[in-house]
Regions:
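Hydrophobic, aromatic-enriched alpha-helical segments typical of multi-pass transmembrane helices
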Residues: 6, 19-268, 274, 278-285
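N-terminal intrinsically disordered, low-complexity tails
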Residues: 12, 17-18
Length: 285
């Protein structure tokens, strides 16, 4: 046999196999697939958009309550109450329109804010957070309908060209209808239940400090129970606004991309000497 002839062909080293996998299969160490990068970027952008709703909702909510004329937050259950509210509404009809519009926008933002806060709870308590988001969204929707009845309809009845008695009967009929009463019950039940349920979810999940969960629950409960007392309502709603801003910052931080590590495990085949490659022998062996 010739000295340059081998009895068998040595197998390719493991290093070459790794290189071929990188070149032909599209694999790269410490690199993510383009589809994964695009999906992660889209999710982060959506989460940050949701986070922006929290401070905007706080501003709208506080502004709506501050602009609400004094004494106009009553539920019209009789003609006497309607006749009492109509002169106040006639004197502040533009203010009522603005306050009612801001209330509808604030309640819509509150529904989105509940969904954004629930996105923070991904581990323990995520079921409770989901229930709280559903309750909050339902209550916000019912509250928007009730604010249209209470604010916008009151301003329309007061500024319209109709007799006081006819306007009072219109308001009593609107508030006394069965759909209006159902919406009212749903709103008041969800308004007080949703913050407590979400606070429990945040407390159990440890996604935020526990004092922030308490601040959110207490602040939103106080904000929802405030009446039309004028601009000083801002002081009572300040804890709610602070909690919403802090939660928005937490959601924004959660949307940051995870850091990538550059460490790649070294394969045992590449680290160990290749035992499958035969040794070259001299002609005399």
């Amino acid at each position: 046999m010739s000295a340059m002839t081998r009895t068998n062909t040595p197998a390719a080293p493991a290093r070459a196999t790794t290189i071929r996998r990188f070149l032909f299969r599209g694999e790269r160490p410490c690199h993510r697939h383009p589809v994964e990068n695009a999906g992660g970027s889209a999710a982060r952008v959506r989460l940050r958009v949701l986070a922006a709703f929290l401070p905007v909702t706080a501003v709208l909510y506080v502004g709506a309550e501050a602009l609400d004329p004094r004494g106009t937050d009553q539920v019209v259950i009789s003609t006497a109450v309607a006749l009492k509210l109509l002169p106040i509404a006639a004197a502040h009809s533009s203010q009522l329109y603005l306050s009612g519009s801001l209330s509808v926008l604030a309640l819509g933002g509150l529904a989105v804010s509940y969904a954004a806060i629930a996105a923070l709870v991904t581990g323990r308590g995520w079921v409770i957070a989901t229930i709280a988001a559903l309750l909050g969204g339902l209550g916000a929707f019912a509250g928007a309908m009730l604010n249209v009845l209470g604010g916008v309809n009151l301003a329309a009845a007061a500024s319209g060209h109709m007799a006081r008695g006819a306007a009072a009967r219109f308001l009593v009929t609107s508030f006394g209808s069965v759909p209006s009463q159902v919406v009212e019950y749903v709103y008041f039940a969800s308004e007080y239940a949703a913050p407590v349920v979400m606070g429990v979810a945040l407390w159990r999940s440890r996604a935020v400090p526990r004092w922030l969960a308490v601040l959110f629950t207490a602040g939103l409960e106080v904000a929802g129970s405030m009446g039309a007392i004028g601009p000083k309502v801002v002081l009572f709603m300040l804890p709610f606004a602070v909690a919403m801003i802090l939660l928005a910052a937490r959601i924004w931080q959660a949307a940051r991309p995870a850091p990538m590590t550059s460490k790649t495990p070294t394969s045992a085949a590449a680290a160990a000497p290749d035992t499958t490659t035969p040794l070259l022998t001299s002609p005399g062996s």
